[in-house]
Amino acid sequence: MPLESELFEADVLAAFPAEVRIPARTVAGALEASSELSPRILVVLDDDPTGTQSVADLPVLTRWDVADFTWAFNHRIDGRRQDAVYVLTNTRSLDPAEAAARNEEVVRNALAAADLETGASISSGASSRIRLGFVSRSDSTLRGHYPLEPDTIAATIAAVSGEVTDGVVIVPAFPDAGRVTIGGVHYMRGTGEDAGKLTPVAETEFARDASFGFANSELAKYVEEKSAGRFRADSVIVLDLNIIRAAGPDGDPEISAKAIADAIESAADSTPIVADIVTENDFRALALGLEEAERRGKKLLYRVGPPFVRGRIGQEIRPALSGEEAYAGNTPSDSGGLIVVGSHVGVTTRQLKALVDQHSAARIVEIDVEQLLGGDSEGYLDGIVGDVVESLHSADVILHTSRLLIKTDDAAESLRIARTVSAAVVAVVNRTLKTFPPRFVIAKGGITSSDVAAHGLEIRHAIVRGPMLPGIVSLWEPVDGPAKGIPYIVFAGNVGDDESLAQVTRKLSNTF
């Protein structure tokens, strides 16, 4: 599809059929039927914690020892084992070698835990065997370690079990956040006065990311670019909307499922497979097709944006949680809440401004990045912690890093700076938690929210309860550690409109 300077979604979609209407229960039923004798659990390696924002009531791990997987595989909600487990790897903040090592460790430990569970089941007289599927969850704007991460997962599975991956299904779409794929091209939807318009993702600020920049919006060409030609664009299987919607709006979803499975029949040796997605029904049609392909014997891995898992397991869209639901089962404290803003993308800066403008009772504490990187950083952080703790006694605190992003031409150096800043934020959060626990914690930005969860709040196991806004921004309930009982809000840097951060804060605050 040619890329034009100005595109309208309605015009682009006019070339394709209408969506196939598919209830979530249809997908859940297909999954249940195939898992009757051998339950399948998706292990989602989430390169930052914002991948959970589209799902609800699933276990989340920030550590991945075999014992952690054993807890997750056995955790039951309403008496049933869950269909997916999220593992917060935080690999988007790591260099390639570190990211590969972490992916391998997670996969090996997950497979070991599944073997232990299968052995225990057989010993108890049951015949069921846990099957694992693996999902590499990454950014809906195409940033992250691709193809390194799916390559590593596939190689580890082959080394441990001998199973060879036939195809890697690439689905970055996130319609709730305005990211859609049409005709094999990935777009961002316009907002406000630009509503209805589409911008190819390579023309956005995200394509200029210091660590993970890219030049192509057409996913087949993106694959060729990122694989340095190992996968040619013309070798990529494209599941466009003609295939995803083959059944038509009133047709049998099985028609679409068969068309999808037929289209990827030739996949072998980790063939890249990209999929068009515009609506939730498209996710469900794709899920049925992938289930059919796997039933036929195809071995697939997934490289996806946040909502893919919801569609793949047939989970209903969870309505946005209220403030009362966020505190359900826990008595909120009278202290202020802590809003931590680390992301530097444009939408986050606008959201921060809107929150500061509207929340006049909040105290603003800034971590100056230049001051942090030079001089007495320890003494500087002592003062920051003191300011935060004192302010929490009577107000919400907005803790943010200075908005001037320090960039270099060296991707590794950019990551090092990002990690130094994140470590400082984590130290402030952790010392605050142990001195004067806040009413709630919101973390804005992927790397920020990951480090705040695992190190600042010392969360090891959590349950994602659902979104705070429709389809975006997830609430985690820590089930252990010093943050147990404190609502933790994971807020991606690149989602929401200018008012979203203020809206979430207003739901949780007692002073806003």
Sequence positions of predicted segments:
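Short, flexible loop segments at boundaries between secondary-structure elements
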Residues: 304-334, 465-489, 493
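Extended C-terminal subregions enriched in glycine
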Residues: 416-447, 452-454
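A glycine- and small/hydrophobic-rich beta-loop-beta segment
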Residues: 325-427
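Short acidic, glycine/serine/threonine-rich loops at helix termini
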Residues: 54-58, 145-149, 179-190, 284-289, ...
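A structural-propensity feature for long, helix-poor, extended segments
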Residues: 78-91, 392-393, 475-512
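N-terminal basic/disordered segments at the start of proteins
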Residues: 8-80, 176
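Cap/lid and interdomain-hinge subdomains that line or gate substrate/regulatory clefts
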Residues: 36-41, 46, 72, 81-83, ...
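Conserved, well-ordered active-site substructure
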Residues: 58-60, 438-440, 444-496, 500
